[in-house]
């Protein structure tokens, strides 16, 4: 039986509310459960990066120490994002620091006056504090949408592959602007799926900061994923419990492969690099 117009409208509202509820629950699962689980499974193997990776053509060739070389493609995403401005002698905040590999590398390589890594994952912060003993580097547990710092505390804020999980992304942008000093920068890299790109663009356009640059980096991230293929296999084997390998590993590999294909083929996913400045 065909729905009447008011019934269709009500049905649309219900579907919209259901989608909002699903997205809220999914974000809560990732923020409160999944990443703590990942820390529990991956910390014993000293996994200090959780991003997709990045490589240019021709290759970037960032000089790395032997101890950093095996994390090259993860590091290069951090390097390309952070070097949009000069961080030497600056006070830097990273929101969504994960397992701290990027924070450690940038502190050692770019010589900021101080570097603070913030994450909501308490297990991850405990791991970072134990794993990364670098002068000028510290880690704080906290919420990206309620940054636990005074106004105008930092010269730069770094945010990489994290904001797609924030329930109130505009609130995050407002908090970044609040803790930045005048003239400070947001150095930002993340992705959105097709259904969220228009909203993302509108939210960034309304940000209380001026956009200095933006760049689509799908090809570079896909290339990084290709170079890290062995890492993905090892991580999936570590994350999926042994009893579930027979039925859960293949779907996990397929999800990663679909993301790679979408980035490589110009599909529905867009990964972008941005630089913003506070007036």
Say what each PLM segment does.
Residues 145-157:
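A short acidic, Gly/Pro-enriched loop at the edge of an enzyme's catalytic core
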Residues 170-182:
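A short glycine-rich, Lys/Arg-flanked "PGG" loop and its adjoining helix->strand segment in the class I
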Residues 184-190:
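Conserved beta-strand signature within the Rossmann-like core of class I S-adenosyl-L-methionine
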Residues 2-49:
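N-terminal auxiliary segments of SAM/dcSAM-dependent transferases
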Residues 219-279:
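Conserved Class I S-adenosyl-L-methionine
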Residues 56, 71-88:
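Conserved alpha-helix/loop element of class I SAM-dependent methyltransferases that forms part
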Residues 156-167:
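A short SAM/SAH-binding and catalytic strip from SAM-dependent methyltransferases
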Residues 93-95, 99-146:
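Class I SAM-dependent methyltransferase SAM/SAH-binding core
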């Amino acid at each position: 039986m065909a729905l009447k117009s008011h019934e269709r409208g009500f049905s649309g509202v219900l579907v919209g509310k259901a989608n909002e509820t699903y997205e809220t629950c999914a974000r809560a699962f990732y923020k409160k459960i999944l990443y703590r689980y990942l820390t529990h499974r991956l910390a014993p193997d000293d996994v200090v990066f959780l991003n997709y990776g990045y490589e240019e053509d021709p290759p970037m060739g960032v000089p790395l120490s032997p101890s950093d070389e095996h994390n090259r493609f993860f590091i290069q995403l951090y390097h390309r994002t952070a070097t949009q401005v000069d961080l030497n002698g600056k006070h830097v905040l990273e929101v969504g620091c994960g397992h701290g590999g990027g924070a450690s590398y940038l502190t050692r390589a770019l010589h900021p006056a101080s570097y603070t890594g913030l994450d909501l994952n308490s297990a991850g912060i405990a791991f970072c504090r134990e794993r990364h003993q670098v002068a000028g580097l510290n880690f704080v547990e906290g919420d990206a949408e309620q940054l636990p710092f005074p106004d105008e505390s930092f010269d730069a804020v770094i945010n990489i592959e994290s904001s797609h999980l924030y329930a109130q992304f505009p609130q995050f942008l407002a908090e970044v602007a609040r803790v930045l000093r005048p003239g400070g920068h947001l150095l930002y890299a993340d992705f959105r799926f097709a259904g969220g790109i228009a909203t993302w663009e509108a939210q960034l356009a309304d940000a209380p900061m001026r956009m200095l640059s933006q760049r689509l980096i799908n090809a570079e991230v896909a290339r990084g994923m290709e170079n890290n293929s062995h890492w993905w296999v090892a991580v999936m084997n570590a994350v999926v419990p042994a009893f579930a390998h027979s039925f859960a590993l293949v779907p996990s590999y397929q999800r990663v492969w679909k993301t790679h294909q979408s980035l490589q083929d110009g599909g529905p996913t867009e990964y972008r690099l941005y630089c913003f400045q506070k007036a």
